[in-house]
Amino acid sequence: MQRLQICVYIYLFVLIVAGPVDLSENSEQKENVEKEGLCNACMWRQNTKSSRIEAIKIQILSKLRLETAPNISRDAVRQLLPRAPPLRELIDQYDVQRDDSSDGSLEDDDYHATTETVIAMPAETDLLMQVEGKPKCCFFKFSSKIQYNKVVKAQLWIYLRPVKTPTTVFVQILRLIKPMKDGTRYTGIRSLKLDMNPGTGIWQSIDVKTVLQNWLKQPESNLGIEIKALDENGHDLAVTFPGPGEDGLNPFLEVKVTDTPKRSRRDFGLDCDEHSTESRCCRYPLTVDFEAFGWDWIIAPKRYKANYCSGECEFVFLQKYPHTHLVHQANPRGSAGPCCTPTKMSPINMLYFNGKEQIIYGKIPAMVVDRCGCS
């Protein structure tokens, strides 16, 4: 009996010394720890997102081989942007990005952008010859994107002013050459006859692929072209030097070059949203807004979904390189842990002005994070 009393006294003494146990306080502490962990995760993701946006700006300039962003204002874009069918079609039916989960990442050219279409505007140059005392339109400069790729199509687009009565228009495209002994200064490229009805003006395209290929082989022969579009009364309807109200009606070249993307294998990863509590490596949504940067030189897309990777990479979750796990087990202090990085990326299509005020349409590789993993 005495032994039982002694045990009871000891138990009461322990309760008095330890004090009352507040279960609600422990619960609050646990909740605070969890909230603090979530806040830290949110801050980490926000920092990762900001770093990703800055990296994207640097990558775009680098992949387009631009030292700085072209200094083109919105007003200049409106003036320079042709109001022509091929360009309107690109903008209206613009495919911002391809996100086909059944395909692997595109790895064409590994780094630099691959051009599909180039819109070349007339350039100002001293090389343009004077014919009959007047400068003749037009002279075109060609970037390396055209020079070092196979040209599959080249169309010269010209705008014909509207007519008041039905008429037949005779269109002539002449290539300027060095003066011959007989005084000849040009040679014919293409001629055609059009019937025009009263109303609005029209855009007309002319195949100049052969001429362009010759210019690329012999750049010194590129002295420019002359455009004529005479109606039955001898009036020239071709817009070569746009006047008031004719912004965007300049002649231009639409050049298409080859593009042969390669395919690679696919892998898998986690997808999360900004409210996710997932701690593991995961892909999060991120929209890049070019207008917010003041990058008016990018015609389309004005924004795109880039996404980013964030999260922990414990060795038990290692997805891509199992040998790293073995290295860590053999030397846990001497091996760096895996990082949450993109394991699959895809390109975006972009329509933009380069530094020479040429409009270029092409792919920029590895700009969209499709999947994330630990490596």
Swiss-Prot record:
GO MF terms here are: cytokine activity; growth factor activity; heparin binding; identical protein binding; protein homodimerization activity; protein serine/threonine kinase activator activity
Major localization listed first in the record, in broad terms: secreted
Tell me where the signal peptide lies: 1-18
Look up keyword Disulfide bond and say if it applies.
yes
Q: Where in the cell is it found?
A: Secreted
Biological process annotations from GO? cellular response to dexamethasone stimulus; muscle cell cellular homeostasis; myoblast migration involved in skeletal muscle regeneration; negative regulation of insulin receptor signaling pathway; negative regulation of myoblast differentiation; negative regulation of myoblast proliferation; negative regulation of phosphatidylinositol 3-kinase/protein kinase B signal transduction; negative regulation of satellite cell differentiation
Query: What domain of life is recorded for the organism?
Result: Eukaryota
- Marked site, Cleavage, at 98-99
A matching Pfam family = TGFb_propeptide
CC annotations in GO: extracellular space
Enumerate the glycosylated residues.
71
UniProt PTM comment: Synthesized as large precursor molecule that undergoes proteolytic cleavage to generate an N-terminal propeptide and a disulfide linked C-terminal dimer, which is the biologically active molecule. The circulating form consists of a latent complex of the C-terminal dimer and other proteins, including its propeptide, which maintain the C-terminal dimer in a latent, inactive state. Ligand activation requires additional cleavage of the prodomain by a tolloid-like metalloproteinase.
Proregion residues excised on maturation: 19-266
**Which keywords does the record carry?**
Cleavage on pair of basic residues, Cytokine, Disulfide bond, Glycoprotein, Growth factor, Heparin-binding, Secreted, Signal
| InterPro entries given in the database record | Cystine-knot_cytokine, TGF-b_C, TGF-b_propeptide, TGF-beta-rel, TGFb_CS
Listed disulfide bonds for this chain? 272-282, 281-340, 309-372, 313-374
Function field = Acts specifically as a negative regulator of skeletal muscle growth.
Name the family the entry cites: Belongs to the TGF-beta family.
Subunit structure, as described in the record = Homodimer; disulfide-linked. Interacts with WFIKKN2, leading to inhibit its activity. Interacts with FSTL3.
Recorded protein name is Growth/differentiation factor 8
